[in-house]
Amino acid sequence: MLEYWGCVHKAAPAYYSYISMLSILCPSFDIVLQILNDQHIQGEYKRIKKIAYNVGETCFSNRIKIGLKQGEHVSGKRVILSVDGGRTRLREMNPHKKPSKSYKAKRAKFDTPWREPKLFVIHVLNKDGSINKHELPIYDAVINDADRCSDLLAGYLKKLRIETAAEILFIADGAEWIWNRAKSTLLKLGVSETKLSEAIDYFHAVEHISDIISTLRKIDKQKKTALVKELKKMLWDGKLEQLISKMTVLSKGRKLILDKLNYFHKNISRMKYDQLRQHNFPCGSGIVESAIRRVINLRFKSPSTFGNHDNVEKLIFLRAIFLAGRWNIMINNLIKLNHKFLQQNLKLVSHLIILN
């Protein structure tokens, strides 16, 4: 019956909410236990982990609706979407790994490879292109799997009725795994192409210009700086054909530079920054880079911090919910979910008793 009152792992909502919150804000579960002890709140290390993972598991299995307000949608709003990848280390079992000679005790052997959490942001813009502070953003991520990331983003957008949005900007860096899926995902959801704008982050494009100019020979540093400034101005003003033509001449047929120029050829339709400014759209993907830093890096990229795939993904999800300002929405939805689940079970039991 404890679940009827919203309990998780025999913990009351206020307790498991606080435990779970500390688990994704603190650098480790040891620090969570230390804080609880300092505040004279009862807690045990194993139980703290179980509660945090249990909350993460329950919310994770209902992740699209658990952090949304009832009836939340983006109808008639200007929406910005952005995707990027971060880095975290995972604990992956390796039974073939040789044990350390300095460590004789028997324990499971594992590797700690770096993996890429792929995170997306959904936010609402004001008419002037600034972020609407009255709307809560949506952050979520999956580890490694680009298709899962795309499917998850599509799930959120479908729930938000993205096809009814007034305008949509999809902005990111030049990673092919992003752009291979971006437009097709939105079109499948019924989004009109006339509403959709795609853009490469301006500052990533500038980095590619700088990389190309840095490889030029027999040009001094001062002239290279002037060239970068000139080409940046062309890029900003939307003079892309002039920019590509100028860099092609500078390359003098060198294959290395011509290969780098393919970046601009492939993304020329996504670099119309003059048109973006006319429509009051941002030209940078700072919202997702900020989210990567706050959601992933500050908690899951620390030295010697690694866990198994499933647990890390659950904690990333909980941290994303908290940093999006949706924690209380999630907890209230979780209580209702537990209540509804138990009610359904009680009805089933009552029905079976009547039949017997």
List where the protein language model places each region.
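Catalytic center-proximal scaffold of phosphoryl-transfer enzymes
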Residues: M1-N356
